[in-house]
Amino acid sequence: MKTTGANSASGRPHPAVLTDFDDTAAVQNVAEMLLNRFGDPGWKDVRQRFRDGHINLKEYQEITFRNIRADRATMQAYVKEHANLRPFFRELWGFCQANDIPMAVVSQGLDFYISALLDREGLSRVPVYAVNTEFRHGEISYHYNHTYPGKESQGNSKGFVVESFQERGCYVFFAGDGHSDQEAARKADVTFAHRTLAKFCDDESIPYHPFEDFRGILLAVREYSKNGHGPIRERPGSSQWGGEAEL
């Protein structure tokens, strides 16, 4: 689904920015950082089963965090000490706030570690669409609130969140890096991709812009807000948003 409606005063769709978290908004894969520090020694075997397609991301995540040797506060403190947001995330959020543009983190990861990094950076107001967790009696329970009806067993869907913004009349800019971002990349109006998502887009002939940090998205959203058109959807290496530009 691509946005076709218009709901802004200018008569064009209002922009919205959605970004993956692990390896995209965050420099690191924060989930794996926590598993390396606090997880069961066999967690990488479970990850390989996921990579080989034997289990889905929801199953992989619940299995590996089931035996984590730390409580919520300990893991959040570790995230605040060791994780970092990618450059220009804060600037993009500031621009979006100043111009009434929705911006949110969309993740199949766990809410408690995402909120920890955002809190440390003073960005606790950034909306987060992730797996909601509850810590009780040494166990974690998981709640999947962002999924298509009947597909709850597959976990959260980033494509579902993209569509929910488009149904509100938004022109969606999306950034991601991995397998869980593929559905969103197909549905977003403009996609910024790196790592395995970029390869997937190449293989599937899905137009995208190369992603290194949030500079390019900031420029693209600012241009759309000013002139009423998004960037031309190009192949890597030719993107007008990939090089140096004055902010």
Positions of the model-derived regions?
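Hydrophobic residues in alpha-helical segments
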Residues: 50-51, 79, 166
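Short hydrophobic segments within beta-strands
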Residues: 18-20, 106, 175
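Metal-dependent phosphoesterase signature
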Residues: 58-91, 95, 99-101
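Active-site neighborhood of HAD-like aspartate-dependent phosphohydrolases
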Residues: 2-63
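C-terminal cap/substrate-recognition subdomain and adjoining C-terminal extension
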Residues: 88-102, 109-247
